[in-house]
Regions:
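Positively charged, solvent-exposed patches that mediate nucleic-acid binding
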Residues: 1-126
Length: 126
């Protein structure tokens, strides 16, 4: 991940959960918040509900790969937390990738083209 560093501190995750914008899909929940940094920071969360360590690591790898392939399109200067859901382990990768791009556009992390939906300040995705 060229333009991104890891988000590691627990208080940073909690701040994003409480104050960040969020977007929900069947594969994951994405929380983001604008920062003053020039680079973005990414955190990936997989709960014990997903299964054993092998399944959780698989979900993390798949999410990291989706993020890596679209990292160049994303605006810099955001903290991003992606919370994996069960479908991120078993679902089709191309559908997961499509959901990721759609959620990032809704959150305003990928600049929307004319005529596309984008969240304003205080709006939540549906």
């Amino acid at each position: 991940m060229k333009y991104t560093v890891a988000l590691k501190q627990n208080h940073e995750f909690r701040r994003l959960y409480s104050k960040g914008k969020n977007a929900v899909s069947p594969y994951f929940v994405i929380y983001c918040r604008k920062t003053r940094r020039k680079i973005s920071r990414l955190g990936i969360t997989t709960g014990v509900k997903l299964g054993n360590a092998v399944k959780r690591n698989r979900a993390r790898r798949r999410i990291r790969e989706v993020y890596r392939t679209h990292e160049g399109k994303l605006l810099p200067g955001y903290d991003i937390v992606i919370v994996a859901r069960t479908r991120s382990i078993y679902g089709r990768f191309d559908e997961m990738e499509h959901c990721f791009v759609q959620q990032m556009k809704k959150l305003g992390l990928i600049p929307a083209r004319k005529g596309e939906e984008r969240l304003g300040k205080g709006d939540k995705p549906q």
